[in-house]
From Swiss-Prot:
Sites of Phosphoserine modification: 509-510, 558, 810
Keywords: Acetylation, ATP-binding, Cytoplasm, Nucleotide-binding, Phosphoprotein, Stress response
Encoding gene (name): HSPH1
PTM text: Phosphorylation on Ser-509 may be important for regulation of the HSPA8/HSC70 chaperone activity.
InterPro entries (UniProt xref): ATPase_NBD, Heat_shock_70_CS, HSP70_C_sf, HSP70_peptide-bd_sf, Hsp_70_fam, HSPH1_NBD
PROSITE patterns: HSP70_3
Spans traversing the lipid bilayer: none
Biological function: Acts as a nucleotide-exchange factor (NEF) for chaperone proteins HSPA1A and HSPA1B, promoting the release of ADP from HSPA1A/B thereby triggering substrate release. Prevents the aggregation of denatured proteins in cells under severe stress, on which the ATP levels decrease markedly. Inhibits HSPA8/HSC70 ATPase and chaperone activities.
Chain positions with N-acetylserine modification: 2
Protein name: Heat shock protein 105 kDa
Primary subcellular site in the record, as a coarse category: cytoplasm
Length: 858
């Protein structure tokens, strides 16, 4: 079972896996642990990751990047419209109103959804993990920003389904970092002590996030989160790009924004300059050759100028920090440490701002790039039964308050209830009780739309169906379980109706029914039961309302009854009571049955099953096309490699092993094949390259074999000669009556001599025949035949010459007629020669009175 953590970022991705030795971040086929979030489309296949990044400038229109923030958003979203202006590829609306990405693929115009694009990236990450683990990858944990809304999270899950990944949990970035930070710490307080407060701050390419966490041994709880979704390292790059665009326009009369390729090159150079300024405070140059119109451009900047240019962005860093302190009611001294991760935290000014706010130095104990992926892998290992991990519970926080609105039964007024407040523990479930006579709707929405970085506050509409009134006409009690699950997604998981069914029982049972009925009747004064059930099982606590319900359903005996009536009467009094009192009529007992109700969900964003299946089928076809194209390219490269290899060696080591006529013929074939490769064979089917390779190998293989045989044959013949000399010497020693071999039977040694003579004669004949042949002729014997002879010789001779000598038994010691041999120590211990027991010695085993054995140890 695979345990994989995927950090899918807007600019790059990291993969962490769990092994027996711990968590490891794995590398891709380029030996790089960072895989760019870039996908390039070509006429034959897709290119994903490093290879796509390398051709981003040359294939700008068909190379897709920075698409993570498009999840779950409509094309009309203001954020999409703003981002559209700075992209090198086209965004168009989909039929469902979502964002579509238009590219040229397989020489045709294709429209892909954001889920499909992310699925393509996940396909690459999955392939990299499988190549590293050498087994299929299915289960994983994927990271998302903590400010992702319900629609965005559902969109990411759909992308994982397209590629066949079972996402065990969508984990918030900072929660993953906190898990990676806390699980290895040994100085955490015990569970019953005051938790240790720590802050986790992440500043990546596209956003700034910070979380306050409480740590105990084996426990992590996120107290609150704050963020700026539009403050990332990319914004600092944009400031540099704007500055140099203005400078080049004034200095060189060049408008970099008019050409997308020039703008992309400037973006790359500005990113490099920003990284250099993080470690150097002096003036640093920016040089780009042939920038536009065959003109070279140059400029320079230092760190102080950069900080002055980005002063507005640096001021925004403190806003989420202040917000976090207000939400959690913490003081800066309550935060014992602040761990920072993300590429943008390497900017010295960013570190200084964070350290100044908290009044302490920031901590950089974690790998700033890989911390999120490692935290996701740890969470996956905790959830997986295949790994035994230290117990560590993770309680996340709901980033936005969620409310429910519904119509009352009269349909004249609406009821609103905030079911999950900001920073409420998650995953978490609550049970709401409604009194209804028919089906009703619940609408979930974010209570604070201004604080949500998403234009739509609505989450979805849920219809509870098959609700009916009780048989007596009263309203039915409907229990609705609302939940924020492990992915941070709001849902109505179940709904049930409490139905009363009258049954007839004996007198004792009817008394029990009378006791239960009042407590089971829902309160008419409140439409929603304020004592709603809260299921904290996933957060580590026990459900409370189940206990409360048990206490209310079983009423205690009334204290007004005299104590004698609580006693069990004797048989005579019971018989008298039966005779005196007339039989009472049977009272109906109310039996309570919970009926499960279907819930229809109409969500703001969720791919339909048919559309999802179509995307899965499309992705499968593209994966197969990529595989076929890779095999075709491999076959083509094999032909090209063969041409270059034989051409170089025919004028070198292979020259002696081919005749002049064949040499000229083979060279002509190599030249013709090379010309064919770059002309007619530039784009051929896989089989055409296989046929060409077979044609080349038909002429080249014999030459290659002759060369290899000439290199290996002397070594193998020398080995055979050494074995023959070894066995011949042993036979000679046997004939000279050497004591070492006098135990070997005469007939056995004759077999050795016969085998040695036969193999020696064969070797002499082969060597004489080979000496008469030239190097450009096929050899008389192959090296594998000589090795077979060596093996055959060893099989015959080794069992004979390695026969062990029989062991010679030493003569038994003679005992003196007068008693034991006093020269031998063992005769003085244990029993003597006549069977008498020796006296007990210290350190010996001897039976005690009960017959058991006592061990006296020195």
């Amino acid at each position: 079972m695979s345990v994989v953590g995927l950090d899918v970022g807007s600019q790059s991705c990291y993969i962490a896996v769990a092994r027996a030795g711990g968590i490891e971040t794995i590398a891709n086929e380029f030996s790089d642990r960072c895989t760019p979030s870039v996908i390039s489309f070509g006429p034959k296949n897709r290119t994903i990751g490093v290879a796509a990044k390398n051709q981003q400038i040359t294939h700008a229109n068909n190379t897709v990047s920075s698409f993570k923030r498009f999840h779950g958003r409509a094309f009309s979203d203001p954020f999409i419209q703003k981002e559209k202006e700075s992209l090198s590829y086209d965004l168009v609306p989909m039929k469902n109103g979502g964002v579509g990405i238009k590219v040229m693929y397989m020489d045709e115009e294709h429209l892909f959804s954001v889920e499909q694009i992310t699925a393509m990236l996940l396909t690459k990450l999955k392939e990299t993990a499988e190549n590293n683990l050498k087994k299929p990858v299915t289960d994983c944990v994927i990271s998302v920003p903590s400010f992702f809304t319900d629609a965005e999270r559902r969109s990411v899950l759909d992308a994982a389904q397209i590629v066949g990944l079972n996402c065990l949990r969508l984990m918030n970035d900072m929660t993953a970092v906190a898990l990676n930070y806390g699980i290895y710490k040994q100085d955490l307080p015990n569970a019953d002590e005051k938790p240790q407060g720590s802050g986790v701050c992440g500043h990546g390419p596209s956003s700034f996030q910070v979380s306050a966490c409480a740590f105990n041994k084996g426990k992590l709880k996120v107290l609150g989160t704050a963020f700026d979704p539009f403050l990332g390292g990319k914004n600092f790059d944009e400031k540099l790009v704007e500055h140099f665009c203005a400078e080049f326009k004034t200095k060189y009369k060049l408008d970099a924004k008019s050409k997308i390729r020039a703008l992309l090159r400037l973006h790359q150079e500005c990113e490099k300059l920003k990284k250099l300024m993080s470690s150097n405070s002096t003036d640093l140059p920016l040089n780009i050759e042939c920038f536009m119109n065959d003109k070279d451009v140059s400029a320079k900047m230092n760190r102080s100028q950069f900080e002055e240019l980005c002063a507005e962005l640096l001021q925004k860093i403190e806003v989420p920090l202040h917000s976090l302190m207000e939400q959690t009611h913490l003081k800066t001294e309550d935060v014992s440490a602040i761990e920072i991760v993300g590429g943008a935290t390497r900017i010295p000014a960013v570190k200084e701002r964070i350290a100044k706010f908290f009044g302490k130095d920031v901590s950089t104990t974690l790998n700033a790039d890989e911390a999120v992926a490692r935290g996701c892998a740890l969470q996956c290992a905790i959830l997986s039964p295949a790994f035994k991990v230290r117990e560590f519970s993770v309680t996340d926080a709901v980033p936005f308050p969620i409310s429910l609105v519904w119509n009352h039964d009269s349909e004249e007024t609406e009821g609103v209830h905030e079911v999950f407040s900001r920073n409420h523990a998650a995953p978490f479930s609550k049970v709401l009780t409604f009194l209804r006579r028919g089906p009703f709707e619940l609408e979930a929405f974010y209570s604070d739309p201004q604080g949500v970085p998403y234009p739509e506050a609505k989450i979805g509409r849920f219809v509870v169906q098959n609700v009916s009134a009780q048989k007596d006409g009263e309203k039915s009690k409907v229990k609705v379980k609302v939940r924020v699950n492990t992915h941070g997604i709001f849902t109505i998981s179940t709904a049930s109706m409490v139905e009363k069914v009258p049954t007839e029982e004996d007198d004792g049972s009817s008394v029990e029914a009378d006791m239960e009925c009042p407590n089971q009747k829902p309160a008419e004064s409140s439409d929603v039961d304020k004592n709603s059930q809260q299921d904290n099982s996933e957060a580590g606590t026990q459900p409370q309302v189940q206990t409360d319900g048990q206490q209310t359903s079983q009423s205690p005996p009334s204290p007004e009854l005299p104590s004698e009536e609580n006693k069990i009467p004797d048989a005579d009094k019971a018989n008298e009571k039966k005779v005196d009192q007339p039989p009472e009529a049977k009272k109906p007992k109310i039996k309570v049955v919970n009926v499960e109700l279907p819930v229809e969900a109409n969500l703001v964003w969720q791919l339909g099953r048919d559309l999802l299946n179509m995307y899965i089928e499309t992705e499968g076809k593209m994966i197969m096309q990529d595989k076929l194209e890779k095999e075709r390219n491999d076959a083509k490269n094999a032909v090209e490699e063969c041409v270059y290899e034989f051409r170089d060696k025919l004028c070198g080591p292979y020259e002696k092993f081919i005749c002049q006529q064949e040499h000229e013929k083979f060279l002509r074939l190599l030249t013709e094949t090379e010309d064919w490769l770059y002309e007619e064979g530039e784009d051929q089917a896989k089989q055409a390259y296989i046929d060409k390779l077979e044609e080349l190998m038909k002429m080249g293989n014999p030459v290659k074999v002759r060369f290899q045989e000439a290199e290996e044959r002397p070594k193998v013949l020398e080995e055979l000669g050494q074995r023959l000399q070894h066995y011949a010497k042993i036979a000679a020693d046997f004939r000279s009556k050497d004591e070492k071999y006098n135990h070997i039977d005469e007939s056995e040694m004759k077999k050795v001599e016969k085998s040695v003579n036969e193999v020696m004669e064969w070797m002499n004949n082969v060597m004489n025949a080979q000496a008469k042949r030239s190097l450009d002729q096929d050899p008389v014997v192959r090296t594998h035949e000589i090795r077979a002879k060596v093996k055959e010789l060893n099989n015959v001779c080794e069992p004979v010459v390695n026969q062990p000598k029989p062991k010679i038994e030493s003569p038994k010691l003679e005992r003196t007629p007068n008693g034991p041999n006093l020269d031998k120590k063992e005769d003085l211990e244990g029993k003597d020669n006549f069977g008498a027991e020796a006296p007990h010695q210290n350190g010996e085993c001897h039976p005690n009175e009960k017959g058991s054995v006592n061990m006296d140890l020195d």
